């Protein structure tokens, strides 16, 4: 049994805390707001994960020092834009040998850094030997109800990925390992952009053909950027790549898809975000990915058009027309290049 601190009290943090508690770990969850901690201590996070009766051993507190005291593992389940701040606040209370696990799917907007890089910038590069990320197709609403789910734990050190695998894995929550930290982080973050775009197509009333094209070509541009940043191309064919992309682009639970639908139906960006009533990571990630693509010299047409809709007022319908009106391409040449790069 491990003593685990869960930093965050949203739907995903609560669902994963439930998994950990059901695995007989001692889990204390940190909530920023007292009323949220009270809901969790009463047995149900009615604000973010309604309908899920929490494990009796799971409890929450607003005292960060108390939550982190002597924790063997610290799981950060907060949105990417709050990650650095909570690292800074937590650092004085985290044991020097504690394992750090991040479960957020995003990139830091102000620096364009992956979240493992953010952690290394605050704790030093040595922290990466005990750092891992958990990602994959996994909506909190289903995980909380013990619906069978498969995810991937990635870390630079395979023993760290295996530690996370042992910590979380259960009959209903299957965990694979992957040494490609870069690819798993990017897959989890970038699929939110494609989900926004697919949602916009939904909102415009386009059909399954359009959505299939968006998802397939979206995966191609995610893979191009990932490869340029040092990721293993095969990662994007796995749970953190195509797996997460499918569920985020198609599920009624997907915040990014729902936000995109609202935009496609004519709502302003602010109105669309407010209609979701939760953090929509894909909006910030679109800005970061647009900058990264420019810096890396990588073509990302869906990201480009989504960026123009979100930040420069391009109409969603014109964005789709721009994508359909691009110059001729040869798909086989792209696939051949990817295969060649894997072999090399």
Swiss-Prot record:
Main subcellular localisation: cytoplasm
Active-site residues from the entry: 191 (proton acceptor)
Top class in the EC scheme: oxidoreductase
Native source species: Desulforamulus reducens (strain ATCC BAA-1160 / DSM 100696 / MI-1)
Keyword NAD: yes
GO cellular component, one term: cytosol
Catalytic reaction annotation: sn-glycerol 3-phosphate + NAD(+) = dihydroxyacetone phosphate + NADH + H(+); sn-glycerol 3-phosphate + NADP(+) = dihydroxyacetone phosphate + NADPH + H(+)
PROSITE patterns noted in UniProt: NAD_G3PDH (PS00957)
GO MF entries: glycerol-3-phosphate dehydrogenase [NAD(P)+] activity; NAD binding
Full protein name: Glycerol-3-phosphate dehydrogenase [NAD(P)+]
Chain positions recorded as sn-glycerol 3-phosphate binding sites: 105, 136, 138, 191, 244, 254-256
A Pfam family of this chain: NAD_Gly3P_dh_C
Superkingdom of this protein's organism: Bacteria
Record's subcellular location: Cytoplasm
GO biological process: carbohydrate metabolic process; glycerol-3-phosphate biosynthetic process; glycerol-3-phosphate catabolic process; glycerophospholipid metabolic process; phospholipid biosynthetic process
EC number of this enzyme: 1.1.1.94
